[in-house]
Structure formats: C-alpha cells, structure tokens
C-alpha cells in the first residue's frame, strides 16, 4: 500500500492539576498553678453542770490553697495551595504508509489561581495566563514475532522555589523545567492460521482466519512547559516561616490496537473429461483431455481499531478509529486439450496346446514269505519284509520295509510272516527313513510305562514324608513356646522375679524335693525363712495389725457429718476385704476422719477387728455377706 490515508480526527479533553502545599507551624505555652488546702481544728472544753446542759465547743479552721498546673500547647499551620488547570481543545492523528505518525495538540490559555490561608495575614494575588504546546513524532515502527515487551523511561519533574522574607513583602517566583519521556512498545503479528476444507467435488468454501496483535511501536514524546508567576502580599512584620513544597506528578500513556481480518474464498470445482479412441486399422490413436474451470473469486477484508490515550496527571479519552479494507482477487483457469499418439498394436491370437498324461503306475511284488532268524539262549529273532501302503494327499505308493520281531523260545514253536498290507501315512515313512521309528513295538511301551510308575510312586511317598515332618516340627515348637509362656510370663512369676524369687525355680525345687520328704521339709523351712512369699496364704501366721489411730477432735457442728460417715462405713465396708481407703479419703476431704498420711494395714471392716467383742463380731458376721458370695 502506497496511498496515504487519514485514520480519524479525535477531540480530547485533558486536565492538568498542580498542587503546592506550604505548612507553617507555630506554638504557644501557657501555665497556671493554684493550690488549696482546708484544715479544721475543734476543741471540746468540759465544764461542771447538769447532764442536760451541752458543753461548750471551740473550733479553729485554717484554709490553704494549692493551684493545679495547666499547660496549653497551640500549633498553627499555614498552607498555600496552587492549582493550575489546562484543557486540550483538539488533537489530530494522521498516518501514512511509511508508518510515521504525527500528533499535534493545542491548548487554550489557562488561568492559574493561587490562594494563601494564614491567620492574621492579608493577601493580594494576581493571575497569569499559561500556554503550552507539545509535538509527538513517531520515530520508527517494526513488526516482530517476539513476546510483547514494554519499556519506558521518564525523567523526574523538578521544580525550584526561591523565597525572600521581609517585614513587609514576600516575592515568590517559580519555573518549571522541561521534562521528556520515551515509551517503547513492540508490536508483532502473533499467529496466523489458514483452514481450507474442500470436502465435496462441487463447491469449495474454505475459511481463513487471520489473527494478529500489534506489539511493537516506538515513539518519543517531548514536552516543554514554563510556568512563571509573581504576586505581592502584605504580611505582618516580624514573621519567620519555613515552607515545605511537594509537587506530585504522574503520567500514563496507554495505546490499544485491535486488528482483525477475514478472508473468504469461493472456488468452483473443475470438471475434467477424458476420451480415448483406439482404432485397430488406423496407424495412430488420439486421446483428448478437456478441462473446464470456473473462475475463482476471493475477497479479503480487514478492520483495525486503535485507541490512544495520553494522561499526564489526569484522564483523557479518545474516539475509536476504525478502518476497513476489502479487495477481490480473481483467478482464471484455462482449458487445455492434450493429444497423444499411441502406436497401434495388433493382437495375434495364439493357440496353446496342453497335453496331460496320466501318472504311470508301477506294480511291485514283495516276497514276504522269506523269513530269516537268529537266536540266542532265550530269544529267537525273526527277520522278514512287511508290505506298507503309504498314502498322502497327493501321492500313494506301496513299499516293503524290513521288520524284526523277538520272541522267547518257550512261547512259540513255529512262526509265519503276516501277508496283510499295513496302511500308513507319509510321516511314518519319513520316520522309518530317519531311523527314529521303533520297530520293536512289543517291548517299547512296557518299558516306558514301568519307569513312569516307579518315579511317581517314589515322588509321592517322599512328599508325604516331608509334609509329616513339617507338621510334627510345628506342633513341637508350639508346645514348647506355650510351656515357656506359662512358666515365665505368669503373674506370680512376675512378682517373684521383681523380689528375687522366681516361681520357676521354686517349681523345679519342689519336684526334686518330693522324692525325699525329710529334705523337702528342711528345704521348705529354709525357703520360708528366705522367701517372703512362702506364707502368702497363711493368714494365721500373720501378726496383729497395728492399733487404729484415734479420730480427730470434731466440734459439735460436725455431728451430722459423723453420723453420715458412720452409716456410710457400715454399708460400704461390711465385706471381708474392706480397705481403710474409705476412712482416709473421707476423713481427709472434711474436718473429721483419719489422717491420710498414717501407714495402716488393710482393715477387715467393722466387726472384724481385734478390738471388738466376740458377741458383736458374731452379729456383724451373720448380717454380712460371705467372701464367696461377694466374688460370685
């Protein structure tokens, strides 16, 4: 494309705001103190008289004041706000085939207003117009297939302020230096896909999809603007101010492009006809091929949309620009006729004669009556010729094969060769030629069967013996493990092992002592003296338990508790093996009862102790349950 075209005309509205802030703090301190104390003294002077008369009273009051301290800290801030607004009137965007874009912007004169707010200060402010111009020129453009990258560099916006303080006037001048930034973008056509689907021989309508995304364009924007302002202010004398200046600035440039294109093509299928004519009498033949093609038309349309946006400290909008291109391509196919000469060929009939002759049949006569023999001490071997009819799918013949038979002398007196013909297949004859055929059919199968039977019997007996040995070994091992567990892992053995007297050793000693009663008695006495578990179940040999400690002194307020405790102990500890745990725990939880720190032996319960009379003990035993009933 070499023609120039104007994409569109866009009207933009842009707003720029500059804010300056000045802060001037001031503080004041006030103090006040007041203290107040009031003290009063009264004196009573007694006098003689009747009881109904009141005695005179003298009082003295002394006030003292203390003032509290109050501190006030006041801080005042002076702020100056400077704002500037500029509006973009028009913007024109033009492009050509050489990929150079020029952007021009025109701003109308802007009015800047300044305001200063300070306590006890009068301000006279003046306004000044401001104009700015910017030019944007495209440097170069390229199409690449790399990933879209964005690189931008911007120089900071600098501002300088100079202030002059005097008792009567303040002069402030400012200048805004030029700033420039460059933005580089890469545009590339990402993907291209073509789909043709000619499926029928009549009409072909392929679809073509063209996808592209622009990712590289580079252009440089330079902006130069100057701001100058001055004003005269009247300020009260003897004022010192420190001002902080902040100048926020931001810029954003956004450009979005959309490209879409479509290709539609319509093709008519070409019809090809072939005709040939062959003449036996002519000297040549002609083959003509005619091709009929319908013109093919194709149309390509594409559209593009570009949305540029340039926002320095504000937002800007632009109208979408759309361009469409369409082109039509026509393809014409020419008809062609092809002629070729083929030399004639004369077919001469040929006659073939096939003669078949039958396979000659030979007749052989075998003398089967001739028999020869040889013998040893026990066996006679007969040799003769056996007639075989060998039959196959395509061949049949008769032959005689020598045969040997071994017969015991005691079993046969005379032998005659068989005169019948045996029918066999070709494999039998092949085995006889190889020497692998066993002619002695009477002895072979019996010898083979005998070896198989003997081997199976021996293997079965050996397998049964091995299984029996394995089962016996497992049973013996399990019995030993169970016996060891009973001896070493019982409850009594565990207690004896902790105290140094295992029960396993005692059981072995008892079995040895049973042979000699005298030695058994002496060993038992020795063991009872050394083994603390020898008299474990001999209750008569035990000594009397220590006396029960007296109960604690309980006040009269705990009488109900004593009755409750006695009733509770009568019901819960009436069995033979009642423990003193109930007494100790119940007494320790309240004021009464016994001490938990006392080391008492096992209590047998009320009515079973030694300090109770015989009649009372019998009464309690009759009313209480027995040990066997308790276990059940």
UniProtKB/Swiss-Prot annotation:
It is a single-pass membrane protein. Keywords: Glycoprotein, Isopeptide bond, Membrane, Phosphoprotein, Transmembrane, Transmembrane helix, Ubl conjugation, Vacuole. It is found in: Vacuole membrane. GO terms for cellular component: vacuolar membrane. The chain crosses the membrane at residues 453-473. There is a cross-link at residue 508 (Glycyl lysine isopeptide (Lys-Gly) (interchain with G-Cter in ubiquitin)). This is Topoisomerase I damage affected protein 7. Residues 1-18, 506-537 have a biased composition (Polar residues). Residues 19-33, 87-108 have a biased composition (Low complexity). The gene is TDA7. Residues 1-33, 87-109, 236-267, 295-322, 335-359, 506-551 are annotated as: Disordered. Belongs to the TDA7 family. Glycans are attached at residues 4, 253, 488, 553, 558, 622. The modification Phosphoserine is found at residue 624.
């Amino acid at each position: 494309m070499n023609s120039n075209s104007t994409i569109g005309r866009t009207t933009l509205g842009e707003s720029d705001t500059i804010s300056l802030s000045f802060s001037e703090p001031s503080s004041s301190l006030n103090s006040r103190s007041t203290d107040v104390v009031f003290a009063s003294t009264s004196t009573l002077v007694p006098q003689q008289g009747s009881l109904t008369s009141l005695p005179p009273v003298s009082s003295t009051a002394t006030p003292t004041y203390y003032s509290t301290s109050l501190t006030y800290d006041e801080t005042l801030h002076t702020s100056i706000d400077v704002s500037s607004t500029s509006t973009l009137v028009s913007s024109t965007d033009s492009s050509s085939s050489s990929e150079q874009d020029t952007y021009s912007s025109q701003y109308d004169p802007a009015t800047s207003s300044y305001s200063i707010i300070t306590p006890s200060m009068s301000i006279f402010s003046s306004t000044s117009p401001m104009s700015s111009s910017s030019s944007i020129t495209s440097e170069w453009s390229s199409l690449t297939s790399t990933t879209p990258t964005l690189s931008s560099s911007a120089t900071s916006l600098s501002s300088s302020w100079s202030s002059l303080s005097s008792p009567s006037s303040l002069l402030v001048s400012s200048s805004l230096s030029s700033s420039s930034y460059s933005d580089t973008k890469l545009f590339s056509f990402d993907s291209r896909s073509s789909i043709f689907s000619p499926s029928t021989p009549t009409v072909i309508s392929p679809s073509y999809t063209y996808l592209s995304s622009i990712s590289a364009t580079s252009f440089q924007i330079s902006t130069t603007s100057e701001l100058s302002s001055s004003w005269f202010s009247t300020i009260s004398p003897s004022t010192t101010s420190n001002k902080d200046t902040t100048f926020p600035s931001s810029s954003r440039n956004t450009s979005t492009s959309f490209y879409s294109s479509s290709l539609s093509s319509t093709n008519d299928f070409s019809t090809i006809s072939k005709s040939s004519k062959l003449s036996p009498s002519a000297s040549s033949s002609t083959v003509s091929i005619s091709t009929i093609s319908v013109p093919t038309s194709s149309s390509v349309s594409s559209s593009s949309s570009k949305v540029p946006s340039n926002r320095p400290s504000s937002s800007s909008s632009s109208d979408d620009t759309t361009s469409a291109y369409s082109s039509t391509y026509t393809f014409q196919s020419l008809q062609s006729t092809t002629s070729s000469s083929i030399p004639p060929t004369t077919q001469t009939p040929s006659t073939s004669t096939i003669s078949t002759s039958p396979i000659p049949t030979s007749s052989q006569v075998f003398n089967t009556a001739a028999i020869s023999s040889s013998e040893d001490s026990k066996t006679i071997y007969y040799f003769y010729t056996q007639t075989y009819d060998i039959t196959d799918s395509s061949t049949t013949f008769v032959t005689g094969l020598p045969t040997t038979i071994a017969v015991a002398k005691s079993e046969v007196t005379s032998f005659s060769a068989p005169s019948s013909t045996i029918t066999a297949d070709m494999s039998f004859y092949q085995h006889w030629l190889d020497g692998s055929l066993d002619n002695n059919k009477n002895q072979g199968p019996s010898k083979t069967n005998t070896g198989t039977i003997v081997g199976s019997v021996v293997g079965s007996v050996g397998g049964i013996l091995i299984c029996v040995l394995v089962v016996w070994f497992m049973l013996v091992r399990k019995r030993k493990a169970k016996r060891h567990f009973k001896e070493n892992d019982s409850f009594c053995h565990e207690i004896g092992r902790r105290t140094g007297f295992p029960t396993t050793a005692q059981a072995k000693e008892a079995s040895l002592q049973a042979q000699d009663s005298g030695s058994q008695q002496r060993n038992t006495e020795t063991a009872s003296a050394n083994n603390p578990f020898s008299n474990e179940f001999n209750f008569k040999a035990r000594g009397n338990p220590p006396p029960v400690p007296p109960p604690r002194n309980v006040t009269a307020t705990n009488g109900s508790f004593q009755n409750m405790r006695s009733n509770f102990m009568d019901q819960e500890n009436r069995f033979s093996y009642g423990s003193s745990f109930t007494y100790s725990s119940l007494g320790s939880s309240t004021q009464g009862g016994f001490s938990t720190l006392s080391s008492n032996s096992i209590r047998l319960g009320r009515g079973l102790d030694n300090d109770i009379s015989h009649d009372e003990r019998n009464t309690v035993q009759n009313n209480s349950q027995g040990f066997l009933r308790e276990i059940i």
